Swiss-Prot record:
Gene: SLC9A7
Tissue specificity note: Ubiquitously expressed.
Location of the region described as Required for trans-Golgi network localization in the Swiss-Prot/TrEMBL record: 533-559, 563-568
Lineage: Eukaryota, Metazoa, Chordata, Craniata, Vertebrata
Keyword Nucleus appears in the UniProt entry: no
Disease: Intellectual developmental disorder, X-linked 108: A form of intellectual disability, a disorder characterized by significantly below average general intellectual functioning associated with impairments in adaptive behavior and manifested during the developmental period. Intellectual deficiency is the only primary symptom of non-syndromic X-linked forms, while syndromic forms present with associated physical, neurological and/or psychiatric manifestations.
Lumenal-side positions: 43-70, 117-175, 232-251, 299-322, 436-442, 498-513
Name recorded for this polypeptide: Sodium/hydrogen exchanger 7
Residues that span the membrane, as ranges: 22-42, 71-91, 96-116, 176-196, 211-231, 252-272, 278-298, 323-343, 350-370, 371-391, 415-435, 443-463, 475-497, 514-534
Subcellular location: Golgi apparatus, trans-Golgi network membrane; Recycling endosome membrane; Cell membrane
Recorded catalytic activity of this chain's protein: Na(+)(in) + H(+)(out) = Na(+)(out) + H(+)(in); K(+)(in) + H(+)(out) = K(+)(out) + H(+)(in)
Length: 725
């Protein structure tokens, strides 16, 4: 190395290790990258938080909008009912009879449906079709993963491939479309219960045999005739290429069952207003009440029809008889459940609830409504159960209620019945434009109109002919024509049709049922008054009041009789009074005793059930054996002895009091106040004109069975004849 090189001390440092500033550069670069990454993460986190906040805000806005639409939809129906009520008042004031309130409610529903369909904007871009070829069936609940978030969807029904692009996009129309279960669980129970609770038992039981024949046999005949005719129509539609999906024979029978449910509410309202013949009213009302129950059980039995083998829609004898057994089981089970749950009279009998009318009315309401839900929960039919619950409540529980609760319960269910029925008919008009799955088939609709006409004719005329063979008071041709004309369809047929609209066949049935209801309510209902005049059916028939009946002269009449049969001479000692009034020519004739099973039931009800369940009837200490004395004293209420004021049920029950009736069992005579004496087995009615009530009404109210009057064997009712002087 040269000497000059040693004189440069910095040259060795430059060529050896790097300078310290260069060493800091990677550190500064790493630190900068970390700061940049942190800043980027912070900004992305803030963006995510902002996005989440925006999603929550959008969700809250959707919930608020949904709540607003719910309020608007309910307000729409309330305004419909309000407008209907005001128009009804105007019609009644002007005595307009060509249009009933139910038809009016349907018209208003149609108008609102048109406004909602064509006057409210649709919301687009919120529906999307997704394909899932890995599954071979639909699920009731579906969880969908959208960007890591799971959303729950529920099944609403099947949509045909041709209508995928026409799915309803209007949220408002979706809001006014109710779940069908709302009709069954909320709206139908008060309608059916009111029919049973307000039943006029006098005329109903006087025509009970005919009513049962029309309701059971007639509905079955109508169902099978309509079903077979519609099956022919379906075959014709297949030949003509007018049927785009499956439509089986069981579907036709199901349609026959639901469309056989009559609802002559318009006709009955006009009958009641014009005071038409009471027997005709009883036949139509009784048939419609029981007919609804039969139709719903019959439809359930048809749905349960499952033949063995691959072809599940072919006829199979074993499956047929199994369906018949299901029909009998469901109907009898529902009847039993309704009657048993309706016998809650002991709750009102052995408690002091009558001191608190509000609690008494509330308990009565809840126990009555729970009958429907209990029957449905147990696999029976709530319609049948709540119907017979209403009849049982009216026969037993009503007598135990306080005066205020009686008025409250009748008015409560009357108001609920009115509102529910008009709500359903308003919804019918609305559904013509808001329902999303209508299937209009002209051939099917025309065939259905022809089928229900022929089914009604085969229902009324042949049965009336056979019934007249055993009836003393024949069902005249004018009555038969009026019953044929009065086969309106209404709330029950609509509720059964809308309950299942998942398949193509059921959607076609629903649309056709809706049009049939419109036609029968508007056209047939509007023609009721002219038809009454054309058929020369009596109107303005006023039932004799109790005071008028008390003026009649009384004479002996046989107990436990069938008013429809001719009387052979008989020396039986069962007798009650028959009035010598305007119908004395008919009433004075002796009549043959009814079947022994009815006599046993009447006697059992009067002597045991009424005293056990109500404050009515003879004390159990006089009807039960001596060894049951303790039980009899426990079940007999003090009101049986010391009740000074008669508790009356309108047109059904009568609770005996002192001065009205003295009951004799064996050698012991027991008056209503509990006093007794020993004499022969007789029963005497006492009191002056001030305290005397119609003897026919007494027994009729006590038994709740109308003109079929019964007394237990070995007991006579002795009534003093009034002096003609």
């Amino acid at each position: 190395m040269e000497p000059g090189d040693a004189a440069r001390p910095g040259s060795g440092r430059a060529t050896g290790a790097p300078p310290p500033r260069l060493l800091l550069l990677p550190l500064l670069l790493g630190w900068g990258l970390r700061v940049a990454a942190a800043a980027s993460a912070s900004s992305s986190g803030a963006a995510a938080e902002d996005s989440s906040a925006m999603e929550e805000l959008a969700t809250e806005k959707e919930a608020e909008e949904s709540h607003r639409q719910d309020s608007v939809s309910l307000l729409t129906f309330i305004l419909l009912l309000t407008l209907t009520i005001l128009t009804i008042w105007l019609f009644k004031h002007r005595r307009v009879r060509f249009l009933h309130e139910t038809g009016l409610a349907m018209i208003y529903g149609l108008i609102v449906g048109v406004i909602l369909r064509y006057g409210t904007p649709a919301t687009s871009g919120r529906d999307k079709s997704l394909s899932c070829t890995q599954e071979d069936r639909a699920f009731s609940t579906l969880l969908v993963n959208v960007s890591g978030k799971f959303f729950e969807y529920t099944l609403k029904g099947e949509i045909s491939p041709g209508k995928i692009n026409s799915v309803e996009q209007n949220d408002m129309l979706r809001k006014v479309t109710f779940d069908p279960e709302v009709f069954f669980n909320i709206l139908l129970p008060p309608i059916i219960f009111h029919a049973g609770y307000s039943l006029k038992k006098r005329h109903f039981f006087r025509n009970l045999g005919s009513i049962l024949a029309y309701a059971f046999l007639g509905t079955a005949v109508s169902c099978f005739i309509i079903g077979n005719l519609m099956y022919g129509v379906v075959k014709l539609m297949k030949i003509m290429g007018q049927l785009s999906d499956k439509f089986y024979y069981t579907d036709c029978l199901f349609f026959g069952a639901i469309i056989s449910a009559t609802d002559p509410v318009t006709v009955l309202a006009i009958f009641n207003e014009l005071h038409a013949d009471v027997d005709l009213y009883a036949l139509l009302f009784g048939e419609s009440v029981l007919n609804d129950a039969v139709a719903i059980v019959l439809s359930s039995s048809i749905v349960a029809y499952q033949p063995a083998g691959l072809n599940t829609h072919a006829f199979d004898a074993a499956a047929f008889f199994k369906s018949v057994g299901i029909f009998l089981g469901i109907f009898s089970g529902s009847f039993t459940m309704g009657a048993v749950t309706g016998v809650n009279a002991n709750v009102t009998k052995f408690t002091k609830l009558h001191c608190f009318p509000l609690l008494e009315t509330a308990l009565f309401f809840l126990m009555s409504w729970s009958t429907f839900l209990l029957a449905e929960a147990c696999g029976f039919t709530g319609v049948v159960a709540v119907l017979f619950c209403g009849i049982t409540q009216a026969h037993y529980t009503y007598n135990n209620l306080s005066v205020e609760s009686r008025s409250r319960t009748k008015q409560l269910f009357e108001v609920l019945h009115f509102l529910a029925e008009n709500f359903i008919f308003s919804y019918m008009g609305l559904a013509l434009f808001t329902f999303q799955k209508h299937v209009f088939s002209p051939i099917f609709i025309i065939g259905a109109f022809v089928a229900i006409f022929l089914g009604r004719a085969a229902h009324i005329y042949p049965l009336s002919f056979f019934l007249n063979l055993g009836r003393r008071h024949k069902i005249g041709w004018n009555f038969q024509h009026m019953m044929m004309f009065s086969g309106l369809r209404g709330a029950m047929a609509f509720a059964l049709a809308i309950r299942d609209t998942a398949s193509y066949a059921r959607q076609m049935m629903f649309t056709t049922t809706l049009l049939i209801v419109f036609f029968t309510v508007w056209i047939i209902g509007g023609g009721t008054t002219p038809m009454l005049s054309w058929l020369n059916i009596r109107v303005g028939v006023e039932e004799p009041s109790e005071e008028d009946q008390n003026e009649h002269h009384w004479q002996y009449f046989r107990v436990g009789v069938d008013p429809d049969q001719d009387p052979p001479p008989n020396n039986d000692s069962f007798q009650v009074l028959q009035g010598d009034g305007p119908d004395s020519a008919r009433g004075n004739r002796t009549k043959q005793e009814s079947a022994w099973i009815f006599r046993l039931w009447y006697s059992f009800d009067h002597n045991y059930l009424k005293p056990i369940l109500t404050h009515s009837g003879p004390p159990l200490t006089t009807t039960l054996p001596a060894w049951c004395g303790l039980l009899a004293r426990c079940l007999t209420s003090p009101q049986v002895y010391d009740n000074q004021e008669p508790l009356r049920e309108e047109d059904s029950d009568f609770i005996l009091t002192e001065g009205d009736l003295t009951l004799t069992y064996g050698d012991s005579t027991v008056t209503a106040n509990g006093s007794s004496s020993s004499h022969t087995a007789s029963t005497s009615l006492e009191g002056s004109r001030r305290t005397k009530s119609s003897s026919e009404e007494v027994l009729e109210r006590d038994l709740g069975m109308g003109d079929q009057k019964v007394s237990s064997r070995g007991t006579r009712l002795v009534f003093p004849l009034e002096d003609n002087a």
